[in-house]
Amino acid sequence: MASGVCPPAELGFGAEYYSVVNGVCSRAGSYFGGRPVLTQAVGYAVVLGFGAFFALFTSFLVWLEKRYVGSQHTSEWFNTAGRSVKTGLIASVIVSQWTWAATILQSSNVAWQYGVSGPFWYASGATIQVLLFGVMAIEIKRKAPNAHTVCEIVRARWGTPAHLVFLTFCLLTNVIVTAMLLLGGSAVVNALTGVNVYAASFLIPLGVVVYTLAGGLKATFLASYIHSVVVHAVLVVFVFLVYTSSSKLGSPRVVYDRLMAVASAARDCSADLSRNGQACGPVAGNFKGSYLTMLSSGGLVFGIINIVGNFGTVFVDNGYWMSAIAARPSSTHKGYLLGGLVWFAVPFSLATSLGLGALALDLPLTAAEAAKGLVPPATATALMGKSGSVLLLTMLFMAVTSAGSAELVAVSSLCTYDIYRTYLNPGASGKQILRVSRAVVLGFGCFMGVLAVVLNVAGVSLGWMYLAMGVIVGSAVIPIALLLLWSKANAVGAMGGAVSGCALGVAVWLTVAKVQYGRVNLDTTGRNAPMLAGNLVSILVGGAVHAACSLLRPQHYDWGTSREMITTVESVHAALDDELKEERLVHAKRWIVRWGLVFTAVIVVAWPALSLPARRYSLGYFTLWAAVAIAWGTVGSVVIILLPVAESWTTITKVCAGMFTNDAVYDRLDDVNLRLRAIMGAMPEAEKRYRQLHETEMHPAGTHPANDDDDDNNNNQMMHS
């Protein structure tokens, strides 16, 4: 192409990414060029600085609550947060726990690959599990109110063999999720700053281990809220930057026009203008090759894999069960529904902005760079410079550490209650359990780093692990769901379904890779066809085997033993007993079933169905689409930031008053006095004994008031005589 037409005339933008070489207009070979955007100093500052800050700050918040509110840091408190967490904080925890590195990176990658359908299918395919899990959260309150883990319920209902099978699946899920978090976190820190990937693997968990050791699940929840605030603040910045304020984009019209131009059939995509898998021209598998359509075969296949795979990451991850256990009974269903709806905005709004923004800017990203998750940092850097990269790196660090802390406590709880208390020391005291819980947190924190290094050496990527997880643990989803939902569920069927589903899923996955691509390796097993087949076989076989066995030999269960066998080590909050009444929980179940199914139908069926007639979007339709992304992201961010503060305002004011006055001390003394009066009123002997001790301490031997009275009477008589 002649030097006078560079960049190509059909674009008219992105000139900084084109140059004339030997008289020919050529596009840059990549965006990053293999060089980190930021210095190593910035990387270490984020990983170590933020890690230390949140470790100290979260531990300080936990201490404040203990000092001025009077929280008792028992083993029950460490592992269940007192079972009294309110709606806003539970929703914040769900959002934070479900926001992985993949949520931020992979969602924008599929936007870069498939256009508007990518962010939608990523968000909807991973939201419905949280909405539907709200039903399980209520059922655990109804049928096993004292449970610490889902595996305790398995043992109470199906016995020791089933307990060991599902304990293995739950621990495997936690290990895989942790591996994904550290693989994604270390890879991005390395790509953006040049920090050694192995060093990042060990340094990222460091701060998480410190505050989790100090405060257990409550510290994890507090940290999750703080991390959610940062993630959503950055989210809003990027969304408004792309669609309202950026000088390079700044409006839906500009983004729309440029998306039409970059996918135009008239665009020249010859060798010098499109290399290394760069986005150029019509999109294969999309309607008219456009990025502006939901009619995308690639997007649909990704959506199916995403939906199937993510059921395993929710239903078999003990972290979600712990969040349900920690919630107040009156807050459980609302927290999960709100958390799911707010989380939808993270991948949808962010990828609709940064993912489509990368295309609209015509960034010379290669397929390899996109696979590493570098689409969002590329767009952020192009629009804001290095400050954009710092913002995105901070956002990613928050996502990885927050979800990682939840996995730490989940593993700690499984090892403590399902191994130590069940098989090693059934009579363990609260102090012993607390000691073991903290030891497991420390041990698993170290194991996290070693595991990430091993997987990095083996060449396993975040994307491969993300897609493969459903194949490995998806078979346990339906048996675990039926554990609480079906009174006839059979123990043998549950074990057989979970094990056979996993085995057949892996076999089909590897077979399809071998048949279709001629070899089995990380590359072929990570492609769409083998992953789709393996995920579907795993979850469907697991469910079918369990259902068939349960229908042939039903194992009726009335939930009596689950209440008798699963006990707390220390007493729990008696004030919550009223919320555990059956009629209130049944009402909550009906509420979450109704609204969970409604929103699932809207997100998975109605929304895409209504988008299909639009085919290739018009400017007006795309403007509406962008407006929904902006509004959902903004409203969700406001709710998730302000609601926990509003619900905890009484506690916040009490802590603040305690820090600057003695009011909190007097309030606690009054409370203790009131409790003692209630006890003494119910026990007359205690009242009598108290008065005797009080008189003895106030009047030592020989100075009893009665003796003084006698002396006064004698003196008076002598005077009268």
From Swiss-Prot:
Location of the protein in the cell: Cell membrane
Organism: Oryza sativa subsp. japonica
Ribonucleoprotein among keywords: no
Membership in a protein family: Belongs to the sodium:solute symporter (SSF) (TC 2.A.21) family.
Superkingdom, taxonomy of origin: Eukaryota
Keywords: Cell membrane, Membrane, Symport, Transmembrane, Transmembrane helix, Transport
Function in brief: High-affinity urea-proton symporter involved in the active transport of urea across the plasma membrane into root cells. May play an important role in urea uptake by plant cells at low external urea concentrations.
GO CC, one annotated term: plasma membrane
Membrane topology of the entry: Multi-pass membrane protein
Matches recorded under PANTHER family: PTHR46154, UREA ACTIVE TRANSPORTER (PTHR46154:SF4)
Region described as Disordered: spans on this chain: 699-721
Tissues/organs with expression: Expressed in roots, leaves and shoots.
GO molecular function: symporter activity; urea transmembrane transporter activity
Transmembrane segments: 44-64, 85-105, 120-140, 164-184, 197-217, 221-241, 296-316, 341-361, 393-413, 440-460, 466-486, 492-512, 532-552, 592-612, 625-645
InterPro entries reported for this sequence: DUR, Na/Glc_symporter_sf, Na/solute_symporter
UniProt GO BP: urea transmembrane transport
Phenotype upon gene inactivation: No visible phenotype under normal growth conditions, but when grown with urea as the sole source of nitrogen, plants show reduced growth and slight yellowing of shoots.
Expression induction or repression: By nitrogen deficiency in roots.
NCBIfam families to which the protein is assigned, alphabetical: sss
Protein name, per record: Urea-proton symporter DUR3
